[in-house]
Amino acid sequence: MSQLCPCGSAVEYSLCCHPYVSGEKVAPDPEHLMRSRYCAFVMQDADYLIKTWHPSCGAAALRAELIAGFAHTEWLGLTVFEHCWQDGGNIGFVSFVARFTEGGKTGAIIERSRFLKENGQWYYIDGTRPQFGRNDPCPCGSGKKFKKCCGQ
């Protein structure tokens, strides 16, 4: 029985993010790493999240916090709306909206994530959360105002 990938690609999970999350393959670019990390949140795979965080971030110290967060969060969907590279292709950025429910409330993470490529492998470094006015267009591309979409 096939299952669509949680990353929103509309591709079967086994053909999409599973090879990265399982360690069979290394994500070839920041967008694939972002999508596979989202899948790891959905599937509650702290090991993959820690492995794909840049070593300088000390992600192993966040293991208990990650696992505790899994119990209270249901991920609803991911929309990637921009990705780009800099510094000869060794630094990448992915902008996205990740929707979730937590404690009965719906929310969204809107982030521009920064990735670094070292020794042929991409790592998540950090992210910034852009500020949007309530009447600005939603960055997810829905055509709605931010306040009526991801800003709820």
Curated annotation (Swiss-Prot):
InterPro entries reported for this sequence = NTF2-like_dom_sf, SEC_C_motif, UPF0225, YchJ-like_M
Q: List the disulfide bonds.
A: none
Pfam families in the cross-refs: SEC-C, YchJ_M-like
Which PANTHER family does this entry report, sorted A to Z? ADENYLATE CYCLASE-ASSOCIATED CAP C-TERMINAL DOMAIN-CONTAINING PROTEIN, UPF0225 PROTEIN SCO1677
Matches recorded under HAMAP family = UPF0225
What family does this belong to? Belongs to the UPF0225 family.
Its recorded name reads: UPF0225 protein YchJ
Q: Give the source species.
A: Escherichia coli O1:K1 / APEC
